[in-house]
Amino acid sequence: MRLMRRLLLFVAAALVFSGCVGSRVVERGEYVDEVVIHEVVSARYEIASSLPVDYADDMEWILRYDSSDVEELRQRAATEDKECDVLFFGSSSIRLWRTLEEDMAPLKVVNRGYGGAMLRDIHYYYETVLADYRPRAFVFYCDNDLGGFGRDLHPTELFDLYRLLVERLKADYPEYPIYFLAIKFNDSRLAKREEHRLFNAIMADYAAHTEGVSFVDVNSPLLNEDGSVNNAYFESDMLHVNREGYAVWSSILRPMLLEELGLDAK
C-alpha cells in the first residue's frame, strides 16, 4: 500500500491544545510512515495534518520553491490589503492569470497562485498562502499532482488531499464557499487524460454532496465536439490556457461568484 493512502486528518471540535506536533529525524533511505508538516489551531477546531513521505529527504522537495515563488508570496502578503471578495490560489494556471482583477470586476480578488505548486506543497504552506487575507470565497486550481512526474499521486490519493483542504478551510473560514476548478485536459499531459477524467468525476460527485463546496467545470468548454482539446485556448506549451482560455473561465466563474456574494454584475 502506498504511503499517501495513509494520509491522516484529525479533527476535534472545541479543543484547547498547546504544544507542538513532533516528527523524528530519519536518515536517508530510512522508511517512515509520515512526517508531520503542519498544525492549525482555530477557535472552532484543531486540525493536525500529516503528509506521508517515503524518505526524510522528501522535505527538500517540498521546500523546493521556498526561496523563490513562495518567498514572493510572503513579500506580497506584507503589503497587500487583506480584505477581498475572493482569494484565488493553486498552481501556475492561477498565477499566470494576469487579467484576473479585470476579468472578475467588480469583485475584489487576490491571486495567491505559484508556479509548480502541488497540493502537497500547499498543505505545507497553508498559512503562507492564505496569510491573513480575509476573503468571502475561495477558488482553487491545481493539477500538478497528476502531472506526469515521478511523484504523481493516484486520483483517489489526490482526492484525500482535497478533502483535507476542505476541512482546513471550513475550520478557519466556516461560512465561506469553496470553488474547485476542474482539471483541464491538455495535450501536454495526454498520457494522464484518463486520470484527469476520473479525478474530475470524483470531485464533481463530492461537491454535489458537500455543503459549501462547488465543482466548476472549466474543462468541457475548452474541448472540441469530439472531446479533443481545442488548442486555440492554449499557449504554445499546450499546457497553460491563453487569454482566450481565461476568458472562457471568466465567463463561467464570474457570474457564479457574483451571485454567491450578492454583488451586481455592473
Model-assigned labels for residue ranges:
Residues 1-10, 16-86, 102, 260-266:
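N-terminal secretory targeting modules
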